[in-house]
Swiss-Prot record:
It comes from the Eukaryota. Restricted to heart. Transmembrane segments: none annotated. The gene is MYLK3. GO terms for biological process: cardiac myofibril assembly; cellular response to interleukin-1; positive regulation of membrane permeability; positive regulation of sarcomere organization; positive regulation of tight junction disassembly; sarcomere organization; sarcomerogenesis; signal transduction. Kinase that phosphorylates MYL2 in vitro. Promotes sarcomere formation in cardiomyocytes and increases cardiomyocyte contractility. Residues 158-170, 183-196 have a biased composition (Basic and acidic residues). It comes from Homo sapiens. This is Myosin light chain kinase 3. Its cofactor is Mg(2+). PANTHER family: MYOSIN LIGHT CHAIN KINASE, SMOOTH MUSCLE, SERINE/THREONINE-PROTEIN KINASE 17.
Length: 819
């Protein structure tokens, strides 16, 4: 039986309801097709109207130029009679002047309303200012100084200088997570000052952040401190004590001056509150060690402060105790805010008088780089304050934060003698136990000895730990080195010019552009791409020279121009200008110098990780998603048509829209072109193509990025197409061994023979493999640039808040105790 008879029987066998449904569906599809065509025609009409408007504006501009030229006095224009053509243009000029007058009146009304608004705001500000002027506290906070304290015994040139620095109010250092210390001197405890002036010093037990409310009455006063003369157990400024481990149950004798987490002040009534960082400072030149092991890990802000709190002014040659006796007067209570910084080389310290001064620190850059830290149990000796720059410790051996130098309150002469007799090996250093036991958190300072004392144990300890540190650096896990790798996940930069609607010009490109014929950026079946520069602006661009042999070739070029005129996306190349000649057409486009993505795949020196492929694939899907939203099929997606913005980043741009087509629902589009190994089965079978055709190519590109292999490549084009038609591919066991199941699922859902079963671009962007980038980066021991920028922004905001708090507290401490 013939095919015609079968068809007639088939139609006759259908029920009437089915025929009605098919007819209704065809009618609706026809209506939808007509609406899409109407939209396209409307868009073309709008484009034509805009172009005609531009032409009219050009004509108007030329008319104005002619009018200005006619008003200028000519050689024979003494009679002042206007020309006939000039008189014809006067009515239009009058209309334009009237329109300008109306616009000026409208703008004047708007400016008047804006002026009234500004006047109201000025009155409100004046009211607020008057309210603040009546407030004594607000006036003090705004000015930052107290007039009635001028000339008080507590003022000094140093304090005046610090006030000037405070009035500037500009932050000079970046502040990371910092602890705040407040030192308060109670008026009721001034009676104990005599004990301190006689040479006594207090020994306070260690206080953690949880014990901020410790009673200062528990302080034990121990003699042994003279009036500045170094005692037998005192350390010199150049001969600072070495830290060592301290037993958990060490006896506390009155001769010791132990202090962990508290600052030794000249007055016994001064109580230091440490939260949450620990500040270690030897008081009055004595070494200090921890009285019991601290189970909590040390904060990054642990520092060795240079001196014991604020000192009263006096002769510079006197010791601290003598200067305190010299001032004599009673000092009102003060609050000292200590800010600890770990992000910048210079540290900012709010001293007892509220100054912002740099402190001497021993920087440990590895504290801010977790990827370069060694294991927690690794023993390490921190660089001494007097160490030369060439004597720095290895980066892998640093984990604790910098310590500040400690200074002795002795006189200048005694200080010079002590510095002369000091040994290089007796500088302060921070030690941590090598075994990972409960002594890891113990921190101590051991009294340094003179050369005659013969106690080289701390120096030998550091020397013995040197090979251990080197071995620890060698045994660092590979993830520690990878922790410093930062991946740029920022979006691709936009074109250096605004999106424009380009029309073909029938002039030579050499009139406005300088084409570098010797510099070829790429090429293909169409011709070559050269680098060019716009003469008027110097803008670097790319000139795509297409050979034209027939009218069909010109239509293809115009189709490419029309498609690129509708594209404005950061992942799609932008068109800048177009020229047409007898034998060629030239498209001037955006220039990127990162090379083809295909070069990244084939380059043996460049190692693509799975996270790199995720960043590339996500941007490809974003560009394809934009194309499909505008009913455009690329139909030639391959690594050669994807350019990288730079040599190292992950930003890409899709190029070559020569084979792109506009998709229409009722139009059965068939194509028989493209690169064989990237063709979809429907293209090989010469069937209807649609959006899933591009998604097949995305799947092939992703497979190549992950493995470096082509899934369907055969020895010949015929074999390749046979593999594609049968959809015969698999995951190579060697290349896909370490890849995640999410990546395999992503590829498997794209390389499907049935095009209706493939993922769309929207579904790809929602796939689990292309999302949760921070979690994937943390698993691969890398960091994302977006995370670093976010952390930097948060740190800046936190720094500003802390700076304002410190400034306000530093001013509030200057209030007198009684009105």
């Amino acid at each position: 039986m013939s095919g015609t008879s079968k068809e007639s029987l088939g139609h006759g066998g259908l029920p009437g309801l089915g025929k009605t449904c098919l007819t209704t569906m065809d009618t609706k599809l026809n209506m939808l097709n007509e609406k899409v065509d109407q939209l396209l025609h409307f868009q073309e009409d709008v484009t034509e109207k805009l172009q005609s408007m531009c032409r009219d504006m050009g004509h108007l501009e030329r008319g104005l130029h002619r009018l200005e030229a006619s008003r200028a006095p000519g050689p024979g224009g003494a009679d002042g009679v206007p020309h006939i053509d000039t008189q014809a243009g006067w009515p239009e000029v009058l209309e334009l002047v009237r329109a300008m007058q109306q616009d000026a009146a409208q703008h004047g009304a708007r400016l008047e309303a804006l002026f009234r608004m500004v006047a109201a705001v000025d009155r409100a500000i004046a009211l607020v200012g008057a309210t603040f002027q009546k407030s004594k506290v607000a006036d003090f906070l705004m000015q930052g100084r107290v007039p009635w304290r001028r000339g008080s015994p507590g003022d000094s040139p140093e304090e005046n200088k610090e006030r000037v620095e405070e009035e500037g109010g500009k932050p000079k250092h970046v502040l990371s997570t910092s602890g705040v210390q407040s030192d308060a001197r109670e008026p009721g405890e001034e009676s104990q000052k005599a004990d301190v002036l006689e040479g006594t010093a207090e020994r306070l037990p260690p206080i953690r952040a949880s014990g901020l409310g410790a009673d200062p009455a528990q302080a034990v006063v121990s003699p042994g401190q003279g009036d500045g003369v170094p005692g037998p157990a005192q350390a010199f400024p150049g001969h600072l004590p070495l830290p060592t481990k301290v037993e958990a149950k060490a006896p506390e004798t009155p001769s010791e001056n132990l202090r962990t987490g508290l600052e030794l002040a000249p007055a016994p009534g001064r109580v230091n509150v440490v939260s949450p960082s620990l500040e270690v400072a030897p008081g009055a030149g004595q070494g200090a060690s921890s009285s019991r092991p601290d189970p909590e890990p040390l904060e990054e802000g642990t520092r060795l402060t240079p001196g014991p709190g604020p000192q009263c002014p006096g002769p510079p040659g006197l010791p601290a105790q003598a200067r305190a006796t010299h001032s004599g007067g009673e000092t009102p209570p003060r609050i000292s805010i200590h800010i600890q910084e770990m992000d910048t080389p210079g540290e900012m310290l709010m001293t007892g008088r509220g100054s912002l001064g740099p402190t001497l620190t021993t920087e440990a850059p590895a504290a801010a780089q977790p990827g370069k830290q060694g294991p927690p149990g690794t023993g390490r000796c921190l660089q001494a304050p007097g160490t030369e720059p060439g004597e720095q410790t290895p980066e892998g051996a640093r984990e604790l934060s910098p310590l500040q130098e400690s200074s002795s309150p002795g006189g200048v002469k005694a200080e010079e003698e002590q510095r002369a007799g000091a040994e290089p090996g007796t500088r302060p250093s921070l030690a941590r136990s090598d075994d990972n036991d409960h002594e890891v958190g113990a921190l101590g300072l051991q009294q340094g000895k003179s050369p005659g004392a013969g106690n080289p144990e701390p120096e030998q300890d550091c020397a013995a730990r040197a090979p251990v540190r080197a071995e620890a650096v060698r045994r660092m896990p590979p993830g520690a080195e990878a922790g410093s790798v930062v991946l740029d996940d920022s979006p691709a930069p936009p074109a250096p010019f605004e999106h424009r609607v380009v029309s073909v010009k029938e002039t030579s490109i050499s009139a406005g552009y300088e084409v570098c014929q010797h510099e070829v950026l790429g090429g293909g079946r169409f011709g070559q791409v050269h680098r060019c520069t716009e003469k008027s602006t110097g803008l670097p661009l790319a000139a795509k020279i297409i050979k034209v042999k027939s009218a069909k070739d010109r239509e293809d070029v115009k189709n490419e121009i029309n498609i690129m005129n509708q594209l404005s996306h950061v992942n799609l190349i932008q068109l800048y200008d177009a020229f047409e000649s007898k034998h060629s057409c030239t498209l001037v486009m955006e220039y990127v110098d990162g090379g083809e993505l295909f070069d990244r795949i084939t380059d043996e020196k460049y190692h693509l990780t799975e996270l790199d492929v995720v960043l590339f694939t996500r941007q490809i899907c974003e560009g394809v998603h934009y194309l499909h939203q505008h009913y455009i099929l690329h139909l030639d997606l391959k690594p050669e048509n994807i350019l990288c913005v730079n040599q190292t980043g992950h930003q890409i741009k899709i190029i070559d829209f020569g084979l792109a087509r506009r998709y229409k629902p009722r139009e059965k589009l068939k194509v028989n072109f493209g690169t064989p190994e990237f063709l979809a089965p429907e293209v090989v079978n010469y069937e209807f193509v649609s959006f899933p055709t591009d998604m097949w190519s995305v799947g092939v590109i992703t497979y190549m990025l992950l493995s470096g292999l082509s899934p369907f490549l055969g020895e010949t084009d015929a074999e390749t197409m046979n593999f594609i038609v049968n959809c015969s591919w698999d995951f190579d066991a060697d290349t896909f061994e370490g890849l995640s199941e999410e990546a395999k699922d992503f590829v498997s859902r794209l390389l499907v023979k049935e095009k209706s079963c493939r993922m769309s671009a929207t579904q790809c962007l929602k796939h689990e493999w292309l999302n949760n980038l921070p979690a994937k980066a943390s698993r691969s021991k890398t960091r994302l640039k977006s995370q670093l920028l976010l952390q930097k922004y948060i740190a800046q905001r936190k720094w500003k808040k802390h700076f304002y708090v410190v400034t306000a507290a530093n001013r509030l401490r200057k209030f007198p105790t009684s009105p």
